[in-house]
Amino acid sequence: MNKVILRILALLFLLGIGAVSAQPDGRIVGGADTTNYHTKYVVQLRRRSSPSSSYAQTCGGCILDAVTIATAAHCVYNREAENFLVVAGDDSRGGMSGVVVRVSKLIPHELYNATIMDNDIALVIVDPPLPLASSSTMEAIEIAAEQPAVGVQATISGWGYTKENGLSSDQLQQVNVPVVDSEKCQEAYYWRPISEGMLCAGLSEGGKDACQGDSGGPLVVANKLAGIVSWGEGCARPNYPGVYANVAYFKDWIASRV
């Protein structure tokens, strides 16, 4: 096979892959129902397409402090803050039993690259602040100080599809997957760079993963935020781990903006 054909194939792969938020709604692949008792740091980002339309859950996020939510840049890039709501303390997608707050500011990473999904991290500033001190259903999560070791179990939470192009569920889901070596991840995604700002996790046999609608949600290791759901090839496919924003890599960036 000559170099021209290889380049064409690589380009087709690149065009075919997208952020996992491309089709919001649904739940984690291969996971199980959970409640916000175990995931008090998880929030829903709900967005309306226009001032006259209704809000719908489009991405996840996690609480860093009373006014700061971490999510994926592709969830908020080129969007208006006034068209978002954050819902905390509610594990039902579309439910209204939690605390609903408006968004005052969106801060996507200034070097976010939508083509290769690099620096796919953003902060969402809410107003009024979340009542963390008086709430039993929401809490902030600590940021991981360093990238987790290969093989360590990580927990993903979200409302994404149960399978590629699958059906949706109203209940928050969780699944555990191991952290994958970055070099092996790069071999899988040979047509797109796996940068220092990315972290990979998943099973070689597939079956467990984040999916459409989980974007912006947390990947947690030892009760600390290690990753943010970013992108992948399909959902839960063998030999294609999920790719996450590597939160430890961005800790200084986060600190400079909160």
Swiss-Prot record:
Domain Peptidase S1: from-to ranges: 28-258
EC number: 3.4.21.4
Propeptide boundaries: 23-27
Signal sequence annotation: 1-22
UniProt key word Translocase: no
One Gene Ontology cellular component annotation held by this UniProt entry: extracellular region
Protein name: Trypsin eta
Gene source species: Drosophila erecta (Fruit fly)
Gene that specifies this protein: etaTry
